[in-house]
Amino acid sequence: MSNVLGMYARSVKENFVKGNGSYLYTDKGEKYLDFVQGIAVNALGHNHEHLVKTMKTQSEKPWHISNLFLIQEQEKFAKRLCELTKFDFVGFQNSGAEATELAIKAAVKYYYSIGKPDKNRIVCINSSFHGRTIATISAGNNPKHIEGFPNLPNFDHFDFGNHEQFKEKITNKTCAILIEPILGEGGVKVIPDQCLKGLRELCDEKNILLICDEIQCGYYRSGKFFAYQYA
């Protein structure tokens, strides 16, 4: 019996022992093309020579010195990301769920800090996926994820493609709109470029923040560094 807590229904019995590029190999020598990519988080493939060399080099340096101190590699990475995205700052997190949590907290805290504490509601798409914390499952509003858990009250939802329903959810208490430019677990639905442009214009007009969750579709998975860049 496995000592790993049974959080996932593992119906696949293959035991992968080696990876190379986009391929995985089992202990029986079988070769598989990896379309799963660790649930869309391993966009760089397996065992890339450059990455292996980089990790070996870093393993001989301090492993963790806390964000209270200057970390040169972190500074370099942040600068590169800002060059690619044209943003000014990067906040590093341990996971996609934590990144979405940070975005949710930042949106609410921003309006609180400028004297608008009641502007604290976030509009999201039904059955989207933003993580498995209490806040992120409330944002996603997927019945199979929120069953048995308290649904946080600060989220308003609309069905994908229902523009009228979306407009009804925008109020003077809306602080942000949280979307996946390409819904993953919601059915691989792509928000059209014109709709993304319209969202940006609406947010500018209404003084609302726009949050794009690209944990599963960013890093060139769609062709560009981020999917929102098509708009």
Predicted region positions:
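Conserved N-terminal phosphate-binding loop of PLP-dependent enzymes in the Aspartate aminotransferase
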Residues: 1-231
